[in-house]
């Protein structure tokens, strides 16, 4: 169990997934889980680890099938969530989702050979609607692609949340153009980064996280488990993600900001 020096305030897990085996998959999905991880499974996992609140991240294998996530948000008020949407979605749909507890849109651009052009009218209209709702854009993309896409996203005025430490390019890491572009975006005041996904980033992940905390500060960082660790379920546990955070952020006061203060303001205020 986590130490009381960490969990002495409400803890927010900023990135989890839920899904069921009967949900329709997109063609050629990145992952194809053969099991369900329901909202109830998630709640039980959170409770076992003393975590109060969580944010469901829309997952690319199910594309814009958001029905189960939205229904779960309506049922469980301790959850918030992001969805995957086409940029042509109407405002009335966004309003209905907002009432359910949706607070953002995920752009799952990772492993996408042709990243969508977010400067088109459809995307600019879409991003303006998200900004008007005070939602955030939650982007998952390779670090080396951040310098090209961040300016257009920032110009829209929408809040940005970048997944998994910005996924720095492994060889250059914190010295890469992508990592520097992410830090510059954070400095401009509308961007946050998730301290998450270390198990997906190799042995350098702790170094990336420590440098991010040092450069960005805990006021712009949120912790996340990435539960249930799709594709790595046999090798990663929830407790290990907590232990990784403790190792990366040894200062208890800084950890409290990353697991409580910052995500509460960003997701639940």
Language-model segments: residues:
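A general structural detector for well-ordered alpha-helical segments in enzyme core domains, enriched
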Residues: 41-45, 65-72, 93-97, 122-129, ...
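Conserved, mostly hydrophobic/aromatic
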Residues: 15, 46, 69, 97, ...
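Alpha-helical scaffold segments that flank or form the walls of functional sites
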Residues: 29-75, 95
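Catalytic pocket-lining loop regions of alpha/beta-barrel enzymes
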Residues: 119-223
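Mid-to-C-terminal alpha-helical segments outside catalytic/metal-binding sites
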Residues: 1-12, 35-53, 217-219, 234-269
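Active-site environment of divalent metal-dependent phosphoester hydrolases
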Residues: 19-21, 61-64, 88-89, 112-113, ...
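Hydrophobic faces of well-ordered beta-strands that scaffold small-molecule active sites
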Residues: 12-16, 54-57, 80-83, 103-107, ...
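Active-site gating/metal-coordination segments in enzymes
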Residues: 63-144, 187, 192, 197-198
């Amino acid at each position: 169990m986590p130490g009381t020096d960490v969990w002495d305030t409400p803890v927010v897990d900023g990135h989890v997934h839920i899904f069921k085996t009967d949900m329709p998959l997109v063609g050629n999905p990145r992952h194809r889980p053969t099991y369900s991880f329901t909202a109830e499974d998630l709640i039980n996992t959170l409770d076992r680890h003393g975590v109060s609140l969580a944010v469901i991240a829309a997952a690319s294998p199910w594309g814009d099938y958001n029905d189960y996530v939205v229904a779960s948000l309506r049922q469980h008020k301790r959850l918030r969530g992001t969805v995957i949407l086409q940029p042509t979605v109407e405002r009335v749909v966004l309003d209905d989702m907002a009432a359910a507890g949706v607070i953002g849109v995920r752009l799952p651009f990772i492993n996408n050979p042709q990243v969508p052009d977010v400067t088109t009218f459809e995307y600019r209209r879409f991003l303006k609607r998200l900004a008007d709702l005070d939602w955030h854009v939650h982007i998952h993309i390779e670090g080396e692609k951040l310098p090209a896409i961040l300016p257009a996203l920032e110009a829209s005025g929408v809040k940005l949340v970048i997944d998994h430490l910005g996924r720095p390019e492994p060889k250059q890491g914190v010295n890469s153009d992508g990592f520097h572009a992410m830090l510059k975006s954070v400095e401009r005041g509308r961007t946050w980064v998730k301290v998450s996904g270390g198990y997906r980033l190799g042995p350098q992940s702790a170094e990336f996280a420590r440098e991010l905390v040092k450069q960005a500060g805990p006021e712009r960082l949120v912790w996340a488990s990435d539960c249930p660790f799709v594709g790595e379920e046999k090798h990663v546990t929830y407790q290990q993600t907590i232990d990784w955070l403790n190792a990366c952020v040894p200062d208890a006061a800084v950890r409290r900001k990353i697991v409580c203060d910052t995500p509460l303001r960003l997701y639940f205020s």
